[in-house]
């Protein structure tokens, strides 16, 4: 059974975030501009995988824009219950909790940790996205690499903020 919130995001244009944990928050202004561009094109729902680094910074940018764009929705996609306890320090855990509290919907992939849980979370992000905003270095042996490759196979629109200049790309 779908909730009203789930039905709303199934009918909207959705953007998922994926990126490395070593994200440089100095790029937040670029990130904000890209999110603004997607909003101007009618994208209203943003999915965040809730990892430290890029994911959490991206969710915070979306939440900061909700004052100007009340139609925005943030979905926190949590890999498993208690994921916040896996954060590297108290600051990340607190930022994580604030995002979960402010999110319009929280999707929990599993009640407990298992070896495939991050891949399943990444699959959920790609399967429910029309576009991807990423911070991807090109290292294919990472969760971000897996997610980007999967998004490319699905021909999703993609913006990579890793380089100093970025462009919107289409794959297919």
Model-assigned labels for residue ranges:
Residues 4-172:
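Acidic/glycine-enriched connector segments
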């Amino acid at each position: 059974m779908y909730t009203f919130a789930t039905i709303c995001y199934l009918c909207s244009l959705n953007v998922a975030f994926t990126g490395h944990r070593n994200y440089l928050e100095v790029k937040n202004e670029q990130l904000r501009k890209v999110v603004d561009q997607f909003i101007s094109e009618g994208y209203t729902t943003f999915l965040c995988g809730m990892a430290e680094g890029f994911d959490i910074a991206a969710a915070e940018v979306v939440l900061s824009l909700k004052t100007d764009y009340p139609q925005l929705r943030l979905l926190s996609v949590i890999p498993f219950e208690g994921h916040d306890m896996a954060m590297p320090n108290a600051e990340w855990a607190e930022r994580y909790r604030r995002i979960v509290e402010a999110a319009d919907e929280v999707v929990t992939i599993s009640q407990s940790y298992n070896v495939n849980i991050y891949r399943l979370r990444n699959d959920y992000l790609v399967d429910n996205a029309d576009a991807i905003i990423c911070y991807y270095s090109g290292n294919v042996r990472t969760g971000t690499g897996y997610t980007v490759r999967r998004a490319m196979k699905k021909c999703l629109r993609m913006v990579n903020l890793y380089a100093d200049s970025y462009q919107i790309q289409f794959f297919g």
